[in-house]
Amino acid sequence: MDHNVSGLNFGEDISGATGSIILNGTDGSSTDAGDNIVFDRTDSGGTDENGNVTLEDGTSGYSVISAPTKTELAGGTDDYALTAGEYESAYDKFEDTESLDINLVLGGRGGGAGDTSSSQDTHVTMLTALVEKRRDCVAFVSPYRSATVGVALSNTATSNVVAAFNLCPSSSYVVFDSAYKYMFDKYNDVFRFVPLNGDTAGLCAFTDQIADSFFSPAGFNRGNVRGAVKLSYNPTKAERDRLYRARINPVVNFPGQGVVLFGDKTALSKPSAFDRINVRRLFLLLEKAIATAAKFQLFEFNDEFTRAQFRNLVEPFLRDIQGRRGITDFSVKADATNNTGEVIDRNEFVADIFIKPARSINFITLNFIAVRTGVSFTEVGG
């Protein structure tokens, strides 16, 4: 390996005796005796024994290693861009409730295969069909990206989000949020906007961990969104009210308090107990647990003994949920009044379970009243 006079570059001339590696350090010639550094493992001509590094004259050249080559793949299809049909085919894989136990479904990109209100409607309709068919999980959806990302005016972003979600179907098994968060992607070493549906689902999982699934995941106690540098848009109070009326849970950056999920509505459009996340998830918990208990009544006799056995399975469980503040009251009915002769002859078993769910506080009213010095509080306070 040659080194030129200036000491900057290596040449390609490599030569030397068999078993030796010679580094020529002067003029590029491998024939000058005494000017080569030789790593000699055969001691074929040096003056020192035992394989030491010696200075000697090489006699035969080594072959030059060829330059590296590269091979490029050709053909194939770049399938990074997904179509709506491919999304639907993927969601169809999760329809089987017996083989797949699912609790939370993350919608990912709000627009699905596109980035418009129309593509969002298509995507949300697919998710709604999935969770309505399963009826044992909740889907979480964010608006399409360009509805809020890069939009200068907060009022315009609110209008975009409301208009997009107005197209989406009503369901108590779906939850809408309002924006994207700006976060650091440590795997690609960049900052990027990410839809908040993953955070909303994560808050539900966090609530399961520190409390119970029938507690609301929103608010300052359990609704703090982690890892958010900023939001794609931060709705004002008036805009939050507008979003909430449209079934959309606003995510808000409160100065000094962080980014907070500030709503716990489901996507159900009509007034109902199931228009709140905690009530829907409470019933998912109850339905899964009690349905598992009910399986053990299959192929038994539909008599008073079996009915009493079922009640004794369910009532302690509901009392436990009541003690953990999930429900205020309940009643289990499985007797001859709802298991009539016709029901028994059809080889069926009927149980009616009445639940009074606990409700979360969405609005607080504080009344401050100034009274005269001589007035008794019992007179003005009732």
Residue ranges and their predicted role:
Residues 3-382:
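Structured, hydrophobic secondary-structure cores that serve as assembly/anchoring elements
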